[in-house]
Design a protein with these regions (language model features):
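Glycosyltransferase-associated regions of secretory-pathway enzymes
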Residues: 1-51, 67-168
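Small-residue hinge/turn detector
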Residues: 52-64
Length: 168
């Protein structure tokens, strides 16, 4: 059921990480979380916005690695796996921009980590469909950055070790 590009990426995971188990979160799994934001995003077929929330719930509740399915792995990332907390990476958001932010397509977290919990709790207090009918299409890297800034994150392309989150 996956496009060729995704099949190639998933095959790279199995090749590079043969000791890992891949967990695919389904529509039914997302609905079972019981989060209004997820349910509203799903109801209007905005899958990526529902997935933004599911990824933080998954890593908070189960621990592990979150990767978008279009990530191709060349080598292992063991050195970035935190004993506790969350690890993610800086990224430049727009070509030519000096502003950088936090990567949401690939991050690692211990079960119960405070950072993923706080991001998930942010979404639990929000509606995807606003009272006026418009959609809250704020992408998760902005939410991550806002929460990380409260922990001391500065938008610079440099390694930062903060309370509960390491940014590389």
């Amino acid at each position: 059921p996956y496009p060729l590009e995704i099949k190639i990426c998933l095959a790279s995971w199995k090749r590079v990480l043969p000791d890992y188990t891949v967990r695919v979160w389904t529509y039914e799994d997302a609905k079972a979380i019981g989060c209004k934001y997820i349910d509203q995003a799903l109801s209007v077929r905005k899958w990526a916005f529902a997935a933004d929330v599911v990824r933080f719930y998954a890593v908070y509740k189960e621990g592990g690695v979150y990767m978008d399915s279009d990530i191709y792995l060349h080598k292992r990332f063991d050195r970035f796996i935190p004993e506790t907390g969350c690890a993610t990476f800086n990224e430049r958001w727009e070509e030519g921009e000096t502003e950088s932010g936090i990567q949401a397509a690939f991050f690692i977290g211990s079960k119960g980590n405070d950072f993923c919990k706080e991001v998930f709790e942010y979404y639990q207090t929000r509606d995807f469909i606003r009272p006026d009918g418009s959609l809250d299409q704020t992408v998760s890297p902005y939410i991550m950055r806002s929460i990380a800034e409260r922990r001391g994150y500065v938008c610079k392309e440099e390694e930062q070790h903060l309370k509960g989150i390491d940014v590389y």
